[in-house]
Amino acid sequence: ASRGLGDVYKRQDKDIIKSTITSTDDGNGNYTNPVIFADVPDIDIIRVDDAFYMVSTTMHLSPGCPVMKSYDLVNWEIVNYVFDTLEDRDNLALRNGENNYGKGQWATTLRYNNGVYYAGFTSFSTGRTYIYHTDDIGNGKWDRFVYDECFHDMSLLFDDDGKVYLIYGGGQIWCIELEKDLSAVKPGTKRKLINDAGLVKGCLAEGSHVYKLNGYYYIFIITWPPHGRRTQLCYRSKALDGKWEMKVIIDDNMGFRNDGAAQGGIVDDKDGNWYCFVFQDHGAVGRTPVLSTMTWEDGWLVVGVDGKVPKTAKIPFAGHEKKSVVTSDEFINSQIVRSYHSFADTPEEAGESDYNGSNLGLEWQWNHNPDNRLWSLTERKGYLRLRTGDVCGTVANARNTLTQRTFGPECGA
C-alpha cells in the first residue's frame, strides 16, 4: 500500500512528532542515494562554518526558493524561503486566464561573501533577474536588486580581486561583471567565455556553477546528448578569458533507467574534503538529489569511485538528528513568523497580498500567488479554512490550491 502523511504522523499531547520520511539516513552511519527522496531540483549549496545551506527550484509555487539547512549533508530541513511573492502579475497569480506553469523561479545561485548571503535567479515569467541578499539566511529579512534582463542558469562568482561576475548561458557561456554591491550590471562588460559548450558530447550545455579553486576557474555544467543521458561536465581555465579545458565528471544513471545524475553544486567541509550535490529524474517523485564525495586528480575534482555515484556511503558527519523537507500535513498556525517579504509591486486589489495572521508550516506551498483574503488558520484552530473566490473550469486554474512535495519510494494522500 502507498504511504501517506497520515501514516507517519501521530499526535502525542497535542504535539506533532516530525517525520523523517524524506531522509535516507539508514541509522547505521550510512545513507542511501537519492539522499533526499523528494523533488529538490536545480540545487546549489554552500557551507558557512559548520552549517550547509541549499536552495532549489520551485517554479510557480509560493513562497518560492526554499532554503534548506543541514549539518551532515544527509539530513535536511527547510528553514526559510527567499521570497513570498515574486511580483503581483496575472500570470503569477492565476488571474484572467493566465498562468506561470513551468516558469517562475529557476536554478538559483547561492553564495556567501563578507557576511552576506546572496540568492540570485532569472525568471522568464517577468523577463527579469533577481539578486536577493540577507545577513540572516535562516530568518530573513531578504532585500533584492532587480535587473531588467535575463541571464539563463546564472552563477555568481566573487573573484579574489573583489570583482563580481555572473556566468550564464546555454551552449554559449557568457560572463558579465556586476557592481561590487551587486546593485547593477556594469555596462560593456559582457563577453563570451566558452563557445558551443557541451557540443563535443552531442548537445549544448547549460546549468553553470562556477568556482575559483587553486588558481583555476571551474565551471560545472550539464549536457543531455541525443539518445543519451544527462551528463555532468567540467570546464577549467586559469583565466576567464583564457583557454578552457573540458572533462566529463559524471556519466552515470546509478542503475535507474537511463536517467543520468547531473546538475548541481559542489561544497567542501572544514577539513578540506569535497562533495557534489546533483539531481536525478525519478518519475512522478520529481528530481531527487544525490550526494557523492569528490577527490582531486590532476587538478580535477573526480566524483565517487571511477566517476560513479555510490548507491550507499558513509554519512560525512554522523550523529546528527534525522531531518526531513516534508514534516507535517497539519494546519497548525506556526508561532514563528518568517520574515521573507512580499515584493508585490502593484496589487490588483488591496488586501490580496496582505498578511492575514496565519503562518503555514514551511512544508506547504501555494500553487501560484495566493489570495490571502480567502484562507485562514485562525478562524478555526487546527484547521485550514478556504473560501471560494472566482469560478474556474479546472483545478489547474483554481487559486489557493495548497501543495506539498511528493516523496519516495511511495506516497499517497
Question: For each of these PLM feature ranges, what is it?
Answer:
Residues 202-244:
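Loop/turn-rich, solvent-exposed surfaces of beta-rich toroidal or solenoidal domains
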Residues 385-412:
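Secreted extracellular polysaccharide-interacting domains
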Residues 338-385:
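Extracellular glycan-recognition surfaces and repeat-rich motifs
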Residues 22-35, 76-98, 130-149, 180-203, ...:
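Blade-edge beta-strand/turn elements of extracellular beta-propeller
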Residues 35, 41, 46-61, 68, ...:
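Hydrophobic core segments of beta-strands in well-ordered, beta-rich domains
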Residues 63-66, 127-131, 172-179, 228-235, ...:
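Structural motif
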Residues 1-9:
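Single conserved hydrophobic/aromatic residue that forms the stacking wall/gate
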Residues 13, 20, 27, 55-85:
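Beta-propeller domains
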